Amino acid sequence: MGLLTGKTALVTGAARGIGKAVAMKFASEGANIAFTDLVLNDDMAAGLEATRKEIEALGVTCRAYAGNAADFEETEKTVKQIHADFGSIDILVNNAGITKDGLMLRMSEAQWDAVLNVNLKSAFNFIHACSPIMLRQRSGSIINMASVVGVHGNAGQCNYAASKAGMIALAKSIAQELGPRVFVPML
């Protein structure tokens, strides 16, 4: 029996990379996994399905949900479906993130908006959708993936740095609003 047996974890941006590693680790500790990722083509859809099968092979229930985490209404619908499918959401990991690096003087508005929408707005969207569920359950954890760049900045990454600084402030504020029932750390 693992540390997370009987729990349901929702991990955003988990078809690959850090999100996949988090989902795999939680599954190895017994958590059932719901994960999301953006699917724009057949290769991405195949990656989503391959990750689902890999996680499920660890002996837990796993479902993959394709969608745009930066879309508020789509996120609300996805979380409602996940809650219906699993019966609870005990852990939310806000991992979805991108970079579109460039010096600020050359950065387009589209580069700025894309990074802030995926990295910060998606976290707000999922927190907004999952918080009522966790409060009704009287427990939960919302883990936010931050970065040292959000504290110190980084040349060529003003959009990414701003998104991660926002993530840090969001986590601190949400921890004050939802605590002590819901634990809200940032990594």
Feature map (PLM): residue ranges:
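Short-chain dehydrogenase/reductase
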Residues: 2-86, 100, 110-111
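Helix N-cap/beta-alpha junction loops of NAD(P)-dependent oxidoreductase domains
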Residues: 99-103, 151-154
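Substrate-binding pocket helix/loop in short-chain dehydrogenase/reductase
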Residues: 103-104, 111-116
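Active-site loop-to-helix junction immediately N-terminal to the catalytic Tyr of the SDR YXXXK motif
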Residues: 107, 153-161, 173
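Active-site helix of classical SDR
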Residues: 127, 163, 171
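Alpha-helical segment proximal to the catalytic Tyr-Lys
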Residues: 132, 176-180
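Residue(s) in the substrate-gating loop at a strand-loop-helix junction
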Residues: 147
